């Protein structure tokens, strides 16, 4: 797998003419209190615990923040401070945009634009001057289904642009990645414009395949297409972070707890242009569907985790 990825990176470097941070494989924070780690410690006699410990708990994963955090600034600060103490870089996901998931399995988010601005302000203040990787609002640029009017779409773009600005101001050492959906969702032609309008010019880059299953090569091809359009229309290109947490077997066309998914390349294979990261936490449910028909979105399941380890 690593050899194949190195070959792909060699190809993509010719297409992406940006520079950026090169992260060492051990740069990123491994949270000893992640849900898989806590579950494995609390169920040490369960045969699934050893598998989860061996395959998942030692890999850096993102921590997601949303309206379930009663004090988001304090929650973010606690996570970032723990990473600082370990001399590692945390990966965070901001996930509180109004009309989140268009009312789907992960519905929720801030009540309105003002509430979101206050929330992202607090989120960014929690990071402060620490280094961090931040993925901003998964699906928010790809999922315009519930934004029926131009005004509603413009409001979404303006909120994301504000989020980038507030993160740059309050968390100047953070690498900010706007989410851009996945390789088989929104046409690159459309996504390039949305990214630009959402302030990608002021961000580090864009994120792909968050919580999805598409092979890394497909995401790289899509990133190249988007970057080509950003270059021709706006005069810049951007690095990309790709969620590889569950793309080891690629996609079968299903997005919600599909059977046959497998863990992908672990966090840390990176160049200045491409960062691979486990953004979705392996074992967390996508919703009550697929091989987890009774599991709410975001709930950790050891059975789902073991399925990803074994690829079934």
Task: Indicate residue ranges for each PLM-predicted region.
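Bacterial N-terminal signal peptides that target proteins for export
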Residues: 1-9
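Cleavable N-terminal signal peptides
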Residues: 11-12, 22
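N-terminal carbohydrate-binding/catalytic regions of secreted carbohydrate-active enzymes
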Residues: 26-126, 281, 285, 290-295, ...
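Structural recognition of the beta-strand scaffold that forms the well-ordered cores
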Residues: 27-30, 62-66, 89-94, 132-137, ...
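Surface-exposed substrate-engagement region within the catalytic domains
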Residues: 30-57, 183-303
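Substrate-binding cleft of extracellular glycoside hydrolase catalytic domains
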Residues: 70, 78-176, 194-195, 200-202
């Amino acid at each position: 797998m690593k050899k194949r990825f190195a070959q792909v990176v060699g190809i993509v470097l010719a297409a992406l003419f940006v520079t950026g941070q090169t992260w060492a494989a051990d740069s990123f924070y491994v949270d000893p209190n992640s849900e898989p780690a806590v579950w494995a410690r609390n169920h040490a006699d369960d045969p699934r615990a050893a598998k989860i410990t061996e395959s998942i708990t030692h890999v850096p994963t993102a921590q997601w923040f949303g309206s379930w955090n009663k004090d988001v600034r304090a929650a973010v600060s606690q996570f970032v401070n723990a990473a600082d103490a370990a001399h590692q870089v945390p990966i965070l996901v901001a996930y509180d945009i109004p009309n989140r998931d268009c009312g789907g399995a992960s519905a929720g988010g801030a009540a309105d634009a003002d509430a979101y601005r206050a929330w992202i302000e607090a989120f960014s203040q929690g990071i402060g001057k620490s280094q961090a990787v931040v993925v901003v609002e998964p699906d928010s640029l790809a999922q315009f289904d519930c934004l029926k009017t131009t005004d509603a779409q413009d409001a979404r773009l303006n909120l994301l642009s504000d989020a980038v600005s507030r993160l740059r101001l309050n968390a100047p050492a953070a690498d900010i990645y706007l989410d851009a959906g996945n390789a088989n969702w929104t046409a690159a032609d459309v996504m390039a414009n949305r990214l630009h309008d959402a302030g990608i010019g002021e961000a580090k880059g864009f994120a792909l395949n968050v919580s999805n299953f598409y092979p890394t090569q497909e995401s790289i091809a899509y990133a190249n297409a988007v970057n080509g359009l950003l270059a021709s229309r706006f005069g810049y290109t951007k690095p990309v972070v790709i969620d590889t947490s569950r793309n080891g077997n690629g996609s079968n066309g299903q997005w919600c707890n599909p059977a046959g998914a497998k863990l992908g390349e672990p966090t840390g294979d990176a160049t200045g242009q491409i960062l691979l990261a486990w953004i979705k936490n392996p074992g967390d449910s996508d919703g009550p569907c697929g091989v987890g028909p009774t599991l709410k979105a975001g709930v950790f399941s050891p059975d789902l985790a073991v399925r990803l380890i074994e690829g079934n």
